[in-house]
């Protein structure tokens, strides 16, 4: 699942870079737009400015001031939870 997320994030637009931080892989353009973190039974995709994303598929979790995440339990959920849409939105926000 981590590799699926990496492919989507790096294909979300030009100038995407990745770095290993905080125990996961962080993706940025001019600023961080998402990160992927692997756990024993799931993978989370974190959005630092997730409160600004349009949650048209009702997949975002978290109720903090800014951060939101999507939890993935199987490779099929990458598609069924519309992850590419959320990552593209986050990239567009980071790009400005």
Language-model region placement:
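Charge-dense, helix-prone N-terminal extensions
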Residues: 1-96
């Amino acid at each position: 699942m981590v590799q699926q997320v990496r492919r989507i994030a790096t294909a979300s637009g030009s100038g995407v870079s990745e770095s290993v931080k905080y125990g996961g892989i962080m993706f940025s353009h001019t600023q961080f737009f998402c990160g992927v973190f692997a756990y024993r039974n799931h993978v989370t995709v974190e959005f630092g400015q997730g409160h600004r994303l349009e949650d048209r598929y009702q997949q975002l979790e978290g109720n903090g001031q800014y951060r939101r995440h999507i939890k993935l339990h199987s490779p099929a959920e990458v598609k069924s939870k519309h992850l590419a849409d959320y990552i593209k939105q986050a990239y567009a926000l980071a790009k400005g």
